């Protein structure tokens, strides 16, 4: 697996995780924006997305090499 494959794998994992989170939220019936718990979960998802984005930036800054 080369570095580009690894980066693509990370993107796939991020997309899969976001998809699973959306399914869970839908199944729980948390579809109303005014629901405090829903807002809390959205914030958690946004934090996770930001962390994944920071990891991607770190990988790119290291020349695409995963350690």
Which residue ranges define each predicted feature?
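Short, charge-rich amphipathic interface segments used for partner binding and complex assembly
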Residues: 13-67
């Amino acid at each position: 697996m080369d570095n580009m494959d690894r980066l693509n794998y990370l993107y796939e994992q991020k997309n899969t995780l976001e998809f699973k989170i959306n399914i869970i939220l839908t199944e729980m019936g948390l579809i109303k924006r005014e629901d405090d718990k829903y807002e809390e979960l959205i914030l958690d998802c946004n934090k996770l997305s930001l962390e994944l984005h920071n990891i991607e930036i770190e990988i790119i800054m290291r020349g695409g090499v995963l350690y």
